[in-house]
Structures are given as structure tokens and as C-alpha cells.
């Protein structure tokens, strides 16, 4: 599934009140990259970090550190726009990255199914709901 890029940051970040953020506005703040390790982590990246050069990058390997650095350093990351407030709390914002931003790109959201296995009805429903959300929130990018 294709989706637009969003900036994920703390609610008191200097850019948190914007309706859209241009990539150049982020240059004074550290980009936070979530690293899961392994040889193929580039291909399974959770953000667009692998496609861009950033003036400041901090690599973390757990989400608690990432959200703490969003607060302590005014750091940010890029995401699909799908953020669960129940997991992250209400202290964070998701703001669209402008279409003409040099760091913008289309993200691919995918899923893995074990070979020769059929996706369960719950799995199918989950994928359907993600597609509906992305279509409604992002102007109907292709699936």
C-alpha cells in the first residue's frame, strides 16, 4: 500500500502547530531513525531514512528512547500517519510533509504472510481497515 509521508513529533515541538511541514524546516532538528538491526534492515525500514540525507541523525533501537528524544531534543521521524494514541499517548503530533519537500517520498506499507498460509479473517479485516484509513486520510493513493 502506498501512503504519503508525515512528520511525527512532540506536541510542544516548535513546528507542532503547523498544518504542513516542508523538509527544509526540519534541518535544525535531529532526525530519529528506528533501527531493528540485521543485514536487511534497509529494506524493512520503518521510515524514509534510507532514502534521504539528514544533517543530524540519531539511531535508536527502542520506541521509548525515540519518544524521549522527541521531547528532549525536539527530534522527529517520518511515518505513514498511522499512529495509535492509545500506545503513544496524546503528547505527539502527526503533520503532513509538504508534497514539494525534498525529503518527501511515497512510503510502502506492507505485510508478510508465511508461504502457503492463508490470511485469517482477522488479518484480512486489519488490512482492509488500514487501506480504508490510508485512502481516506491521504487522498486515495494507490494500494
Regions found by a protein language model. Give the residues of each.
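Beta-alpha-beta core module
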Residues: 3-4, 65-115
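Conserved beta-strand scaffold positions in the cores of enzyme catalytic domains, especially
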Residues: 31, 57-59, 94
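Short beta-strand-to-loop elements that line the ligand-binding cleft
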Residues: 52-65
Amino acid at each position: 500500500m502506498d501512503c504519503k509521508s508525515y512528520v511525527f513529533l512532540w506536541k510542544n515541538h516548535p513546528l507542532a502547530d503547523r498544518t504542513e511541514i516542508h523538509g527544509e524546516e526540519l534541518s535544525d532538528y535531529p532526525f530519529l531513525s528506528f533501527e531493528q538491526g540485521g543485514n536487511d534492515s534497509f529494506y524493512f525500514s520503518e521510515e524514509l531514512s534510507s532514502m534521504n540525507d539528514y544533517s543530524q541523525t540519531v539511531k535508536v533501537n527502542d520506541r521509548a528512547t525515540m519518544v524521549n528524544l522527541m521531547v528532549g531534543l525536539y527530534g522527529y521521524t517520518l511515518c505513514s500517519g498511522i499512529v495509535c494514541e492509545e500506545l503513544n499517548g496524546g503528547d505527539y503530533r502527526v503533520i503532513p510533509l509538504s508534497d514539494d519537500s525534498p525529503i518527501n517520498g511515497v512510503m510502502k506499507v506492507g505485510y508478510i504472510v508465511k508461504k502457503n498460509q492463508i490470511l485469517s479473517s482477522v488479518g484480512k479485516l486489519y488490512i482492509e481497515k488500514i487501506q480504508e484509513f490510508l485512502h481516506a486520510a491521504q487522498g486515495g493513493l494507490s494500494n
